[in-house]
Amino acid sequence: FFENQQLQQGQNVPVIANELHGVHLEIHVPALAQLIEALNTGEADPMQVLPVLQAMYQHISDTAQLAAGDPALEAEVAQTKQVLQFAEEAINNTMKAVQKLQRDQAEMEGGEEGVAMAEQDAKMQEHEIKMQIAQEKAELDMAIKQKKHEQEMAIRDAKAALEFRENS
């Protein structure tokens, strides 16, 4: 609950390895979905929501990465990945809306130079955000694959030990 308040203010909140990640996902994912819905219906201001979206995306992605190691949370992680895809789309769309607002504002302030600088800054910011999202996605996928591999190895080892015991 406290973390959601911090995330709603656009603050980055680190994920601690020994937390109950399933509970965190149950709390954070609906809040993110609600934020996306508010953005889609026009209830939320894109300029104000963008940092919140980014902070929530980062935190939930990190939490899902750690939760991926728990077989009991497999369904929760799959649902979270789906919501993260919606969040990624919302971030990209919001970035475009913010860029348009910045272009319009630069035009109102006057001058081609101001428009060009605003466009360049916005494109750079958009590129950085897309790179960050791509990196987080890759890290999440890699963590899930690693955890599954570790589980498969543990199951194989347990079966081999059982067979060895039965044959001895």
What is each residue range found by the language model?
Residues 1-168:
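C-terminal anchoring/interaction modules
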